Swiss-Prot record:
[4Fe-4S] cluster binds at C171, C176, C179. The keyword rRNA-binding does not apply. Its cofactor is [4Fe-4S] cluster. It comes from Archaeoglobus fulgidus (strain ATCC 49558 / DSM 4304 / JCM 9628 / NBRC 100126 / VC-16). One of its GO terms (molecular function) is metal ion binding. Keywords: 4Fe-4S, Iron, Iron-sulfur, Metal-binding, S-adenosyl-L-methionine. Residues 157-410 form the Radical SAM core domain. This is Uncharacterized protein AF_0243.
Length: 529
């Protein structure tokens, strides 16, 4: 029997699956389908949009499993997630099953509409239910993970992907008013099972990994009593084992860290931070949920960490991780999330949030990422009763706060993290144009506007020239002055760039400096590679 996996992408508090990130779900499902003797083929929603003929082919498939759900919406460069509107036209195969966090937000009316177009909805979390719905009897998610690794070779961007790896599921806190992680029971994968999946993916050609599918990386392998105590020795062995099995990994990063774990267990957390700096790759980010710096909002929404605990976690990660490394980025930095529209929020909340960020700046601490989003209301969460009334009430304050942060915090912070002239390595071009857009394959990579037309999937090293609010503009490193375009020279040197262009070939560094000044030697080479 023929089955299609249609990846409409997911973005959850503890899982990212929008290109270049590949969530565990397609891999689990592929392994599951193989165990049930299906001949499975993987498609991204972007591929189906671009290839109508493939959509026609799907009508001959026996089964389609559609994955979708953006629980924490963001802006995406690498792909456009499946929308609800598109979903109703996804009943393509003989039998169609919908899985993923999108099922948490479907109304009764939408469920009936899906039934009308013959799309079966499987409740989230879905893996065991899907397997049983397809007639399976011996459910083993770890076995499916390793067996399904080979599906990544069918990804349109392979090998330019980063695989999201699940270490455990659920949240030891599980009380935040808005969060969907409460739907998961705590379930832990053994180091051996995680390593087996990483090795299977590595053997398929994957070189970029994010240990991101958990709510708190620091508590993996820890003692789960109260606030989990990290186990730095076990984590060090785990990291060593990854490199022993997969010595040519290019990216090894994490995602979520609960700042409460760090604040409650500072000594163990410090040792784990050192392990991450030593055994993971630079440019790493620990995304932490501050959500609000207003103590009233913290209490009313049962948030995990106080502003003081978050500030402590930011400082501790900075202490060991802020130093720049070989790829141009600091080894390991914190990031923080703000959620707007929570219970108890007032106009003063926005001032408290901003004051928190000002204190970070005053203490000369680095934040790699400040994520500001409006709360998304899910049925079954405490925020369901509250609704979106504060979002509507504080719309102006939200926009003003976001703009203020982008202007006064993000840009100065970016200048500290990536000073002018800093070389950034291994930038993958994702969008080609007069300004080509490129990023490292990493967790929360910085967007780089690369001056010049470069083909998609080319890897380029570049030097920082200028700044946006959350991005930098750069030119190719070691750019040969005699091969550079007029646009590149004018961008670097202004009006003098045209003079340099007209007087080519330039014969020496001294001649280049005489025309363009000392700064020209930072970015341009004479006869450079």
């Amino acid at each position: 029997m023929k089955a299609a996996i249609i990846d409409g992408y997911v973005d959850e508090p503890s899982c990212l699956g929008v290109p270049p990130y590949v969530a565990p779900y397609p891999r689990y499902i592929y392994g599951m389908l193989k165990s049930l003797d299906y001949e499975a083929t993987y498609f991204t929603i972007d591929h189906l949009r671009a290839h109508p003929e493939t959509v026609e082919r799907l009508k001959k498939f026996d089964l389609a499993v559609i994955i979708a759900g953006i629980a924490v919406p963001g802006k995406y460069l690498g792909g456009k997630p499946l929308s609800k509107k598109e979903l109703f036209s996804m009943g393509l195969a003989e039998r169609n099953l919908l899985v993923g966090p999108i099922t948490l937000e479907l109304s009764q009316k939408e469920l009936r509409m899906l039934e009308d177009v013959e799309i079966e909805v499987i409740d989230f979390p879905f893996e065991r239910k899907l397997f049983e719905r397809l007639g399976g009897e011996k459910f083993n998610l770890n076995a499916f993970a390793a067996r399904g690794a080979e599906v990544v070779r069918q990804h349109p961007d392979f090998p330019h992907i980063i695989c999201e790896i699940e270490t455990y599921r659920g949240c030891y806190w599980g009380k935040c008013s808005f969060c969907i992680e409460r739907v998961h029971s705590l379930w832990f994968r053994s180091p051996e099972d995680v390593l087996g999946e990483v090795k299977a993916l590595y053997d398929c050609g994957v070189r970029h990994f994010r240990l991101g599918r958990q709510t708190d990386f620091f508590s993996y392998l820890g003692e789960f009593e109260g606030v989990p105590r990290p186990n730095p020795e076990a984590m060090k062995k785990f990291h060593r084992a990854i490199w022993d099995l997969c010595p040519k990994i290019k990216t090894l990063h994490i995602d979520n860290v609960n700042p409460k774990t760090i604040a409650e267990h500072p000594e163990e957390s410090a040792e784990l931070i050192k392990t991450i700096v030593m055994y993971q790759t630079p440019g790493n980010v620990a995304a932490m949920g501050l959500e609000s710096a207003d103590e009233r909002v913290v209490r009313k929404n049962s948030l995990a960490a106080s502003p003081e605990e978050v500030m402590f976690a930011i400082e501790l990660i900075n202490r060991y991780g802020r130093h720049p490394s070989y790829n141009g980025l600091p080894y390991f930095l914190p990031g923080i999330n703000f959620v707007i529209g929570l219970k108890g929020e007032t106009k003063e909340t926005f001032e408290l949030n901003y004051r928190f960020l000002e204190e970070v700046m005053e203490r000369n601490l680095l934040l790699r990422r400040i994520n500001i989003r409006q709360v998304k209301i899910f049925p079954g969460t405490p925020m369901e009763k509250e609704g979106d009334r504060r979002l509507k009430k504080h719309r102006k304050e939200f926009i003003a706060f976001k703009n203020r942060v982008r202007e006064n915090i993000d840009t100065p912070m970016l200048k500290k993290i990536l000073p002018k002239g800093r070389r950034i390595t291994d930038l993958r071009v994702e969008v080609e144009g007069k300004i080509s857009y490129a990023r490292q394959l990493a967790t929360y990579p910085i967007l780089v506007g690369l001056v010049g037309k470069y083909p998609r999937n080319l890897y380029v090293d570049a030097r920082v020239v200028d700044y946006g609010h959350r991005s930098v503009t750069a030119v190719e490193a070691d750019l040969d002055v005699n091969k550079a375009t007029l646009e590149q020279l004018e961008f670097l040197l202004g009006k003098v760039g045209r003079e340099v262009y007209m007087r080519r070939p330039i014969g020496s560094d001294a001649e280049l400096e005489a025309i363009g000044g000392k700064e020209a030697l930072v970015y341009l080479k004479v006869g450079g590679e």
